[in-house]
Amino acid sequence: MINGSIVALITPMNSDGTVDYASLERLVEFHIEQGTDAIVAVGTTGESATLPMTEHAAVVCQTVKFASGRIPVIGGNGANATAEAIELTKSMQKSGVVAMLGVTPYYNKPTPKGLIAHYTAVAASTDIPQILYNVPGRTAVDMKPETVAELSSVSNIIGVKEATGDLSRVARLRELCGEDFLLYSGDDATAREFLLLGGNGVISVANNIVPHAFKAMCDAALAKNAQLAETIDQPLTGIYRSLFCEANPIPVKWAVHRMGLIANGHIRLPLTELSEQFHGLLIETMKQAHIEVK
């Protein structure tokens, strides 16, 4: 399965709010050229919460077509209603995605029993591998390692994206879930340590703007070359911080636009474009990371 540097891809949009497929194709080509190991289409960073189901599935399917077998694509299939998650999963069944990434149901705060029932039902609706996604800072529910361990026995649940930033969970998840269960970091600031502790990869926001360097860091960490990984990672720490000066994906979408990779930085309400007070911060950290700003 997929190890290494995985981009949580933004979804570019036209000024009228429709999806900008020309820019999306450009982004896919950019990540192929930069050596990114895989793409997550329409996850949190891809504005999944504001894409209706048919549009969500269409963006995932088109991303796979643009990739044309040259880079694996993982499709986001999270929803806070199990029936909706199943419907979304079925709509991508023949898309060509190599796996699906499903965030814990948000807002309604399911119990561990509810999480197990939810993910088991979604997994049963498809033969495509499923990756769990724990990000309590956004969902208000924390899926503990013990719950993940129970779900790891489901044949097509193959891994988890753990975005708490709690590095103690790496060893605990590995102990409970076994060596074959895939552990992905969802926190750029602690990703290097996550990999050195035994993680398999990183599903990254920063990878949208520093893919070559982020890939090099991941490769070094996976090879257990801690010194090289730190040397590559250190200049990126400012980027990691500045990309969360406002809610993701507001800053990263603005940054990708300033790189000239997408036609404009339109983002769907209730999110709004990056506040002017943060423009200077982001430009400065991008320049420090040797990113060309246009």
Curated annotation (Swiss-Prot):
Pathway: Amino-acid biosynthesis; L-lysine biosynthesis via DAP pathway; (S)-tetrahydrodipicolinate from L-aspartate: step 3/4. CDD domains: DHDPS. The record marks 44, 107 as: Part of a proton relay during catalysis. GO terms for molecular function: 4-hydroxy-tetrahydrodipicolinate synthase activity. It is found in: Cytoplasm. Its EC number is 4.3.3.7. The active site is at 133 (proton donor/acceptor), 161 (schiff-base intermediate with substrate). It catalyses: L-aspartate 4-semialdehyde + pyruvate = (2S,4S)-4-hydroxy-2,3,4,5-tetrahydrodipicolinate + H2O + H(+). Pyruvate binds at residues 45, 203. GO terms for cellular component: cytosol. One of its GO terms (biological process) is lysine biosynthetic process via diaminopimelate. Belongs to the DapA family. Catalyzes the condensation of (S)-aspartate-beta-semialdehyde [(S)-ASA] and pyruvate to 4-hydroxy-tetrahydrodipicolinate (HTPA). PANTHER family: 4-HYDROXY-2-OXOGLUTARATE ALDOLASE, MITOCHONDRIAL (PTHR12128:SF66), DIHYDRODIPICOLINATE SYNTHASE (PTHR12128). Homotetramer; dimer of dimers. This is 4-hydroxy-tetrahydrodipicolinate synthase. It comes from Shewanella frigidimarina (strain NCIMB 400). The gene is dapA.
